[in-house]
Amino acid sequence: ENDMKLVDGSYLTMEDSSEGSTDSNPMLRGEHLMDGNSGISKAGIGRIYAYGATTADHDVDFIAVIVYVDRYNEETGKWGQIATWTVEDENTYYVSSGKVVLVERGYYYRVHCDHFAGNKADPMYDQDFSFTNGIFIP
């Protein structure tokens, strides 16, 4: 039996790290987007390492990952965004980005990512998302 709290798809854990991928989502990926990954890990006192990557199954005109860092707010019972950044590239099949983020201690944090891949001729880019569980930063 799992006593861990589940908030918007993410468990609140005492783990040192967590990873997520688009595999866990039933959304259609479309014809270009193959996989998306997100990751979070402890990186020292009051620091986390946040990571996101998008993989297409062939070279595409445009590929991107938007990485969001969320902190759990016990009062609202919701995740709140504290950091975000975007990395994009052209004429390739893979893009990734990772950063060390300074965070307040005593909270749970997670990473979620939006993943995009497509060609300019497409009416819309393929899009999916991934997210990690929450890890506690003491």
Predicted regions and their residues:
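N-terminal prepro-regions of secreted/extracellular proteins
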Residues: 1-41
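Short, surface-exposed binding/anchoring microloops in extracellular/periplasmic proteins
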Residues: 30-69
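Extracellular Ig-like/FN3 beta-sandwich strand-entry sites
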Residues: 45-47, 62, 104-112
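Beta-strand elements of well-folded, non-transmembrane domains
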Residues: 54-58, 69-73, 102, 117-119
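Solvent-exposed serine/threonine-rich low-complexity stretches and specific carbohydrate-binding patches
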Residues: 67-68, 78-92
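Exposed aromatic-hydrophobic patches
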Residues: 93-103
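Enriched for extracellular/lumenal, surface-exposed ectodomains of secreted and cell-surface proteins
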Residues: 108, 112-122
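Short beta-strand elements
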Residues: 120-138
